Amino acid sequence: MNKIDFVVTWVDGNDPVWKEKKSRYDGSVSTSKQSMNSVKAYREWGTFKYWFRGVERFAPWVNKVYLVTDQQRPSWLDINSEKLVLVDHTEIICNDCLPVFSANPIESNIHRIPGLSEHFVFFNDDMYLTAPVEPTDFFSEDGLPKYNTALSPIIPERYGTGNFQINDMEIVTSYFSRNEILKNGQFFDPKQGLKSIVKSLLYRNSQFICGFWESHLPYPLLKSTMDLIWEKEKAVLGRTSASRFRNPSDTNVWLFKYWQIASGQYAVGNPKLGRLFSLDNAGPDFWNLLNSGKYKIMCINDVYDIKDEEKVMQEFIAAMKNLLPDKSTFEL
């Protein structure tokens, strides 16, 4: 197995310097796009140290951990940690596009990180390792990224991610025909799991490829695939890179995953590896589940309408501390 790096992006939306910088550009966001760029997108829960603790405890085999930020670093972070590499936006995004306050341009350029391995796993900072993982959870023995997927319609929510998925699929389907995608996609491999197979059966006779189901779990990616798509779609990805705030015309990181699926250059992963959860449903049962080891990965997603944010935040931190009480070597 080749070296595997982890890449994670992070922003401290409470940082007054960052907030002042963002305020200089807020006027450029039209009213129709303001909800797409709400405070929720930048909220810092104080749980990021547990992301690092999870990596050290549950993935000690990782080669390097690249933390991508906009001239920020957590106060508790040990920048001299052996496996840690800090990456500033200026190292991967052209100066004419900076500053950016959207994940889309950042994620579209992570392959430019100096020294990044060909095989890497991209994490959002709400994707936590909660039980031991192995390299083979992310890549096959011959180096293909592992995914679970299904044919699934894209949901066009006004302030959701559907616009990005449509833009991603528009690119993918311009290079791969419906029949090629059905042949390459491995949608009916038993390892996909019954639920995914049934979903794909429902949509396989559609005239067009309706979209791929998205798990919202970490993304195993190949640097060479990102290079290839940039070579083919430089204009589109260049526009996303110049998108200071989230814009309905953006692509996102799923494009690179979808390309692997459409081309057949992926292996089917474990459908029970992890799951997406939302903090608006947090309660005793959820916090117990977090500590149960049932899932190796849990994406714990922030939402707009949490009723008692302070209470949920305290319970969130307490549950993570219970799971990962010991400092990691990434901490001072």
Swiss-Prot record:
GO MF, any single term: transferase activity, transferring phosphorus-containing groups
Keywords, comma-separated and alphabetical: Exopolysaccharide synthesis, Transferase
Organism: Streptococcus pneumoniae
InterPro entries in the record: Stealth, Stealth_CR1, Stealth_CR2, Stealth_CR3
Superkingdom, taxonomy of origin: Bacteria
Protein name (Swiss-Prot/TrEMBL): Capsular polysaccharide phosphotransferase WcwK
One GO BP annotation of this record: polysaccharide biosynthetic process
General remark: Stealth proteins are part of a protein family that is conserved from bacteria to higher eukaryotes. Family members were first identified in microbes as proteins that help pathogens to elude the host innate immune system. Microbial stealth proteins are involved in the biosynthesis of exopolysaccharides. Stealth proteins are predicted to function as hexose-1-phosphoryltransferases.
Keyword Zinc annotated: no
A family per Pfam: Stealth_CR3
Recorded family membership: Belongs to the stealth family.
EC numbers, comma separated: 2.7.-.-
Enzyme class: transferase
